[in-house]
């Protein structure tokens, strides 16, 4: 396993603009690797996620940024490719693309987006991945007669680096698509604690069927909680029905992370702080991350 990566999840609330700028600088100074930002364009109090990322990359020099996850039905793949490549160039190669098929169909339709069945949603994501890769190879004229994202255009610009496409997949068809075509899995909070191993196996089987090495696919575990001085935790970190936030000491936090990394091959941790404070960032960065990285290094030795 490569060195564990750690990120922080942000809410793009319009009322918090000043704090968001300061907060990402604190995240970077604390040593985190990336920031992920939820993308729900139909939430009135939220800023546009991509516009916010474009602003925050200018406040940082090292952090990577990723929508968690881009609402594909409201962001056509053709323009998503252009926006993503632009952000990657503007940031010097610090942008990755998380994609979601869409769930809140009433709200999506309310903004003029389509309603899609589960099967249609998977097909649309598959088609979008092909369009994204085509648009990121510059200097060509591409014609694709897709059902969801038809393309007849000159391609480009090329991003600064090979942008990873990470999916927030839940169902078996989407997990299979991920293993076949995508670069990473952002395990949704709705994926139950006990369901994660089976989901991993589905991804692995699809990857092998496509001639890919399952180990090449990144896996992100999302953990909600607070670092405390009380040695209490739950055997069911917050995911799916019955899950709970993790509220415990740094050593138990590190133990939970190590179990996900060693037992289920998650290589990236997305922290969703219950309290988005400087002190919580400091505690996680200085007391949890070193323990977790040391433990996973020992497991691989």
Spell out what each predicted region is:
Residues 1-12, 103-109, 143-163, 220-242:
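N-terminal small/glycine-rich loop or linker at the start of catalytic domains
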Residues 1-60, 163, 274-277, 287:
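N-terminal beta1-alpha1-beta2 module of alpha/beta enzyme domains
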Residues 2-15, 73-143, 188-197:
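Flexible, glycine-rich active-site loops centered on histidine and acidic residues
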Residues 6-18, 70-78, 159-170, 237-252:
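Active-site mouth loops of central-metabolism enzymes
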Residues 6-10, 35-37, 64-68, 95-99, ...:
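Hydrophobic faces of well-ordered beta-strands that scaffold small-molecule active sites
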Residues 15-27, 79-83, 167-177, 248-262:
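Short, acidic/polar
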Residues 27, 31, 56, 87, ...:
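Conserved, mostly hydrophobic/aromatic
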Residues 47-70, 124-131, 209, 214, ...:
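Alpha-helix-loop-beta-strand connector modules within alpha/beta enzyme cores
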């Amino acid at each position: 396993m490569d060195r564990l990566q750690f990120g922080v999840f942000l809410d793009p609330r319009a009322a918090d603009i000043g704090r968001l700028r300061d907060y990402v600088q604190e995240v970077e100074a604390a040593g985190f690797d990336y920031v992920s930002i939820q993308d729900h364009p139909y939430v009135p109090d939220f800023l546009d996620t991509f516009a916010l990322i474009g602003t925050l990359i200018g406040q940082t020099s090292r952090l990577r940024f990723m929508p968690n996850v881009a609402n594909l039905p409201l962001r056509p793949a053709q323009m998503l490719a252009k926006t993503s490549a632009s952000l990657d160039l503007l940031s010097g190669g610090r942008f990755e693309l998380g994609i979601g098929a869409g769930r809140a169909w009433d709200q999506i339709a309310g903004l003029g987006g389509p309603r899609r069945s589960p099967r249609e949603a998977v097909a649309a994501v598959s088609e979008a991945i092909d369009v994204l890769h085509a648009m990121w190879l510059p200097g060509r004229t591409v014609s694709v007669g897709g059902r969801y994202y038809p393309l007849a255009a000159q391609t480009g610009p090329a991003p600064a680096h090979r942008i990873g496409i990470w999916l927030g997949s839940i169902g078996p068809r989407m997990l299979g698509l991920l293993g076949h075509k995508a670069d990473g899995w952002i395990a949704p909070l709705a994926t139950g604690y006990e369901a994660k191993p089976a989901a991993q196996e589905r991804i692995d089987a699809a990857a092998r069927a496509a001639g890919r090495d399952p180990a090449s696919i990144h896996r992100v575990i999302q953990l909600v909680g607070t670092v405390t001085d009380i040695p209490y935790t739950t055997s069911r970190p917050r995911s799916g029905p019955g899950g709970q936030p993790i509220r415990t000491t740094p050593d138990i936090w590190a133990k939970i992370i190590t179990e996900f990394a060693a037992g289920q091959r998650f290589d990236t941790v997305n922290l969703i702080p219950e309290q988005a404070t400087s002190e919580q960032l400091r505690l996680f960065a200085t007391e949890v991350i070193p323990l977790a990285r040391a433990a996973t290094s020992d497991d691989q030795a």
